[in-house]
């Protein structure tokens, strides 16, 4: 069975490391790499710096051989799981911020879900 690796894209400064790790996994398993961005209603409120970082992360994913996909929805974890299920993804690579989240983003982290 071919390994199908899914890496989740974000504007996080650490996302580049996650993308490189996923690309190495895809190469090691002789599999395919897909990079997924979940666009939420809050994506339009992203600051200029975050927008530029996201563009850079998308570019890195493309350079790493990933097929770039975008889905839309409010529930990021649901969108990732549903995309993975429908696409036959065998492994999901996501990062987790070490920083405490406040305000709108408080609560259970994506990794914990």
Model-derived features with residue positions:
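Short, ordered loop/turn segments at secondary-structure junctions
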Residues: 37-41, 73-74, 97-98
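Generic structural signal for helix capping and beta-alpha/helix-loop junctions
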Residues: 43-45, 78, 101
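Short, hinge-like loop/turn segments at secondary-structure boundaries
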Residues: 50-54, 86-88, 110-111
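Glycine-rich, Arg-bearing micro-motifs that act as flexible, cationic patches
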Residues: 96-113
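Small/aliphatic-rich secondary-structure junction motif
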Residues: 2-49, 55-63, 69
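Short, well-ordered alpha-helical microsegments
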Residues: 15-16, 77-78, 111
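Structural beta-alpha unit
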Residues: 64-91
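A conditional alpha-helix N-cap/helix-loop micro-motif detector
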Residues: 15, 50, 73-74, 107
């Amino acid at each position: 069975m071919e390994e199908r690796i899914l890496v989740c894209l974000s504007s996080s400064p650490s996302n580049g490391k996650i993308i490189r790790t996923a690309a190495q996994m895809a190469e090691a398993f002789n599999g395919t790499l897909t990079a997924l961005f979940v666009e939420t209603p809050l994506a339009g409120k992203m600051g200029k710096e975050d927008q530029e970082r996201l563009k850079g992360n998308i570019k890195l994913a493309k350079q790493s051989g990933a097929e770039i996909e975008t889905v839309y929805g409010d529930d990021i974890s649901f969108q990732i799981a549903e995309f993975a299920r429908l696409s036959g993804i065998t492994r999901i690579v996501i990062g987790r911020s070490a920083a405490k989240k406040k305000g709108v983003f408080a609560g259970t982290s994506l990794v914990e879900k």
